[in-house]
Amino acid sequence: VSAVVGTHTHIPTSDYRVLENGTAYITDVGMSGDYNSVIGMEKQAAISRFKYPKNKHPRLTVADGPPTLCGVIINSRKNGLAESIKPIRIGGVIDNVGI
């Protein structure tokens, strides 16, 4: 397996590494989008849905604040096993500080 890249919490983790048998791993690569939002959507509408679930709500709209791009770059050998993994975090409120 070349890589196992998790995402769900939308909070990037710092546990990236190449495992013993050549699999690149990170628990959560993070979210791409506006971090001053509710998983990329306008905050007030998302909070209203949570607070008043029985009310009818319009579709959520994408937040338009400064975006952050999160991801990883994985270099692999010809045999498909990972050689390295490096997180990327560009723009927005989290960046490659300390990476």
Task: Please identify what each model-predicted range represents.
Residues 1-62:
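Conserved beta-sheet core of the metallophosphoesterase superfamily
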Residues 45-99:
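A short C-terminal boundary segment appended to hydrolase-like catalytic domains
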